[in-house]
């Protein structure tokens, strides 16, 4: 079995998978959303303290399975440094105690493998990665090498939802609550936001301007009613999704994708999923979607990504395993 450990942000998660059959032996995640909600976002120091409690508790659940573990896969990049260190420290200690190999997993690569939790990975593949920390269009070639085609210059897709939710006092995280309120909209033409970089040829995303447009409209309201909230959420969500699709259409003209995947916590947005289905049908491209319950951070995807390295014997020494809060991929240049 392969043990997966995830602690890159505010989710503590542990998973066990069979490296031969991909059977999920154990999976559990402890979310910190409730603890961070009162602050309107993730507080790194609090996240670190909560990981120190949650990870040992999760490990305790699988004590009887430790003798059957053949390798440990752990997220070491990118993420919050104080969060990453919790998972990496536990992985190192277990690896030494059990005398089994250690595998370093890039968190973003883990998200890509959320598309293949129950099957073999097949490349080449185009991927849209949308989360609270990242917005990227990636290309993975036949050898599994990753090229970044586009990314955001400021806020991420998911982060913009969190910030709009905070402006409207809807709580944290914002993705689900903004989507739910958007569905209550009765006047779809009331607010019109400009799609960022609409006529800009650069393969780049930017959500800060859209966020400011929302702030301006909110400031014009003397009091904010439920109808106001629903109408604003609808206009914002639609514009944010349109921004994603606008750049994707440009990428599809440059790359003849036959298969395209969508991953990351924000990929659970139903509006975005529907638009991507239309885009892929238009381009005769197979759309791969991560299961809704595994869009957000989880240890299953880390174990799954680690399994690929396990068979290639891409292990890492304890002394060489470090955390890298910020890390990217090779960038595409037009």
Swiss-Prot record:
Enzyme class, first EC level, given as a word: transferase
InterPro entries listed in its UniProt record: ATPase_NBD, Gcp-like_dom, KAE1/TsaD, Peptidase_M22_CS, TsaD
Chief place where the protein resides: cytoplasm
GO biological process terms on file: tRNA threonylcarbamoyladenosine modification
Entry's cofactor comment: Binds 1 Fe(2+) ion per subunit.
Cofactor(s) required for function per UniProt: Fe(2+)
GO CC terms: cytoplasm
Name of the featured protein: tRNA N6-adenosine threonylcarbamoyltransferase
Parts forming coiled coils: none
Compartments, as annotated in UniProt: Cytoplasm
Reaction equation(s) it catalyzes: L-threonylcarbamoyladenylate + adenosine(37) in tRNA = N(6)-L-threonylcarbamoyladenosine(37) in tRNA + AMP + H(+)
Source taxon at top rank: Bacteria
Enzyme Commission number(s) from the entry: 2.3.1.234
Binding residue positions for substrate: 129-133, 162, 175, 269
MF terms in GO: iron ion binding; N(6)-L-threonylcarbamoyladenine synthase activity
Gene3D superfamilies: 3.30.420.40
SUPFAM superfamilies referenced in this protein's UniProt entry, alphabetically: Actin-like ATPase domain
Record-stated family: Belongs to the KAE1 / TsaD family.
Keywords of this entry: Acyltransferase, Cytoplasm, Iron, Metal-binding, Transferase, tRNA processing
Binding positions (Fe cation): 107, 111, 297
Function: Required for the formation of a threonylcarbamoyl group on adenosine at position 37 (t(6)A37) in tRNAs that read codons beginning with adenine. Is involved in the transfer of the threonylcarbamoyl moiety of threonylcarbamoyl-AMP (TC-AMP) to the N6 group of A37, together with TsaE and TsaB. TsaD likely plays a direct catalytic role in this reaction.
Key word Metal-binding present: yes
PROSITE patterns listed in its UniProt record: GLYCOPROTEASE (PS01016)
Source organism of this protein record: Campylobacter concisus (strain 13826)
PANTHER family in the cross-refs: TRNA N6-ADENOSINE THREONYLCARBAMOYLTRANSFERASE, TRNA N6-ADENOSINE THREONYLCARBAMOYLTRANSFERASE, MITOCHONDRIAL
